Amino acid sequence: MVTPALQMKKPKQFCRRMGQKKQRPARAGQPHSSSDAAQAPAEQPHSSSDAAQAPCPRERCLGPPTTPGPYRSIYFSSPKGHLTRLGLEFFDQPAVPLARAFLGQVLVRRLPNGTELRGRIVETEAYLGPEDEAAHSRGGRQTPRNRGMFMKPGTLYVYIIYGMYFCMNISSQGDGACVLLRALEPLEGLETMRQLRSTLRKGTASRVLKDRELCSGPSKLCQALAINKSFDQRDLAQDEAVWLERGPLEPSEPAVVAAARVGVGHAGEWARKPLRFYVRGSPWVSVVDRVAEQDTQA
């Protein structure tokens, strides 16, 4: 029979043996000792208000966060470590290569209460400036409304359509050239996005939006991220409320479809040019072009 005194000594002997080369095996009839493992806590076309969510703790919101959200895409590999904020050198390229380069990057929006929303870009459109009959800057036309298109690369150009919806563009290299963001794959803050979308929807506000409906269109993504006219002419490389992070992996060339832009039928031959780019097979894309997909594969 083992006395209580001996029972009390067993843990001390075990603790002293920890860190030595090898533990002595238990004698026959005596159970092996074990330690508890600590577990981590569970955790449209080129042609607004912030969510009332309980604020999360804010330390110092001076720069972009360095950790991605919990959502993992099946169309891109998972992040390996921290994501990097993209600066002027990324945006300073012509509209077409920039529109392609946007695919796979992560757009981040920090709300006033500290909540951060993230979405991976899966669809864009390039607008080439004065020569492009579908661009707001066609013919070199510059107005207070489209001034962001003529500012340095990385400047936001946000305009309103139908008197109530917003579209978000980013200026590129070349006067009057820019890239329209058409669709995102939601990554982080989906419930806040859903709340923002529902607040601004008409008629069907009672229907719960599916994840793939949150950001599948230029105005939808602006609603989901609370992007409005106040963001016009902001610098995406410097702003503290909205920025771009480098995605873990850009889609390979065969995965990128080049198709005609949407809603620019008035632009003659420019309406048919393949200046819209999207990730093949992504359910978050706003408009799928099967003919263009076949041409891309050929």
Swiss-Prot record:
Documented activity regulation: Binding to SSBP1 in mitochondria inhibits glycosylase activity in the context of a single-stranded DNA (ssDNA), but not a double-stranded DNA (dsDNA) substrates.
Family annotation (CDD domains): AAG (cd00540)
Biological function: Hydrolysis of the deoxyribose N-glycosidic bond to excise 3-methyladenine, and 7-methylguanine from the damaged DNA polymer formed by alkylation lesions.
Root EC class: hydrolase
Gene designation per UniProt: MPG
Biased composition (Basic residues): 9-25
Subunit structure: Binds MBD1. Binds SSBP1.
Domain of life, source organism: Eukaryota
Stored Gene3D superfamilies: Methylpurine-DNA glycosylase (MPG)
Matches recorded under InterPro entries: Formyl_transferase-like_C_sf, MPG, MPG_sf
GO-annotated biological processes: base-excision repair; depurination; DNA alkylation repair
GO cellular component: cytosol; mitochondrial nucleoid; mitochondrion; nucleoplasm
Location of Phosphoserine modifications: 78, 252
Subcellular location: Cytoplasm; Mitochondrion matrix, Mitochondrion nucleoid; Nucleus
The keyword Iron appears for this protein: no
Region of interest (Disordered), residue spans: 1-65
Molecular-function annotations in GO: alkylbase DNA N-glycosylase activity; damaged DNA binding; DNA binding; DNA N-glycosylase activity
Reaction equations catalysed: Hydrolysis of alkylated DNA, releasing 3-methyladenine, 3-methylguanine, 7-methylguanine and 7-methyladenine
Protein name, entry field: DNA-3-methyladenine glycosylase
Transit peptide feature range: 1-17
EC numbers, comma separated: 3.2.2.21
Source organism: Homo sapiens (Human)
Family: Belongs to the DNA glycosylase MPG family.
NCBIfam families on file: 3mg (TIGR00567)
Pfam families: Pur_DNA_glyco
Keywords of this entry: Cytoplasm, DNA damage, DNA repair, Hydrolase, Mitochondrion, Mitochondrion nucleoid, Nucleus, Phosphoprotein, Transit peptide
